[in-house]
Amino acid sequence: MKKIYILIAIIISSCTNNKNFEGKINFGIVIHGGAGTILKKNMTEEMERMYMNQLEEAVKIGYQIIKNNGDGKDAVEKTINYLEDSPLFNAGKGSVLTNEGTVELDASFMNGKSLDAGAVASVKFIKNPISAAIKVMKNSPHVMLSGKGADDFAKEQGLEIVDQNYFITER
């Protein structure tokens, strides 16, 4: 776990010290792979490399969007979509199961400048909950939707809906 923090610090440092951004506002990207415990003693070198590569790729996605003058919201959404789509992390595919053996997902987004916010909670079928949270912020009068109402809203918004089996992976 210590190596992950070191990698994140190095990546943030390289983002803020890039000569291509002279005269522009510096930025950093900080990510994590979800809640839970991953013990180094239980991880092979190959497995650790897989986790590190996925985390690094997620940061690169957001970095490239910002580097190309993209929107911060898009950088956050695409970075988190990547993590949600990876079975290695506890966000989206690969999530921890409830006591009933199902997956319930939460996501939230806030724009620090405007203070606009959107969130979804206890969703079961939205492939990328962060995208649903952003849709709540942009396309509804609400700040948060939960459960079936949030799943229905996401479907109405054209987001990808998947079966519960999509999220369940072997660990």
Spans of model-derived segments:
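Bacterial Sec-dependent N-terminal signal peptides
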Residues: 1-24
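Alpha/propeptide regions of enzymes that mature by internal proteolysis
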Residues: 19-171
